[in-house]
């Protein structure tokens, strides 16, 4: 599966923003910095004209395109809300409570249904979102603050000294 994420970075220009993300995604030993993804394309990948080549074309500068920057943040919020609504429709809290009781009754062993059931998976996914963990469902990462929380970039936009160096860099992650 593929997911388009936007990373917030501070840089002097579009090129620097792009290279910050490109450089940081691969660790010194060659592993991907994002542990849930096996490969990625910086610049939008399948959402861009470049497809599978890194490209700076879709990088958004707040200084050059403040409205588009804010629109992208609002779109990310909407995507996150949609994910949470999907989880809300799928989670069965009564079943989860029953699974916990059964686990305790079964000497700390999950049943086959518990091990392979989707209810626990949706609950885990929901908890990760509530904790601002960086997952395929985050759609956003703040590389300045090292978090999936979106509030910090919005605070930086309100700071008169910092909005002009804010960039959103798109990444097509495969997982």
Identify the role of each PLM range.
Residues 8-11, 17, 63, 89, ...:
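A sequence-composition feature that detects small, non-aromatic residues
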Residues 27-140:
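Low-complexity, serine/threonine/proline-enriched polar segments
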Residues 1-36, 163-175:
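Short, extreme N-terminal segment that most often corresponds to the first beta-strand
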Residues 18-19, 69, 96, 116, ...:
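Phenylalanine-focused residue identity feature
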Residues 1, 125-175:
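Acidic, proline/glycine-rich low-complexity IDRs
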């Amino acid at each position: 599966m593929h997911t388009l994420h936007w990373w917030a970075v501070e840089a002097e220009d579009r090129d620097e923003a792009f290279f910050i993300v490109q450089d940081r995604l691969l660790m010194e030993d060659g592993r991907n910095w994002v542990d849930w993804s096996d490969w990625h394309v910086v610049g939008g990948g399948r959402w861009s004209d470049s497809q599978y080549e890194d490209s700076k074309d879709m990088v958004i500068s707040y200084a050059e395109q403040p409205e588009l920057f804010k629109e992208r943040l609002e779109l990310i919020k909407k995507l996150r809300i949609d994910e949470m609504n999907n989880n809300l429709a799928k989670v069965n809290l009564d079943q989860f409570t029953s699974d916990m009781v059964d686990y305790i009754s079964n000497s700390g062993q999950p049943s086959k249904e518990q091990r392979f059931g989707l209810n626990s998976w949706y609950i885990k996914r929901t908890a990760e979102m509530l904790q601002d963990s960086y997952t395929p469902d985050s759609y956003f990462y703040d590389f300045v603050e090292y978090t999936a929380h979106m509030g910090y970039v919005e605070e930086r936009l309100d700071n008169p000294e910092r909005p002009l160096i804010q960039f959103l860099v798109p990444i097509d992650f495969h997982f």
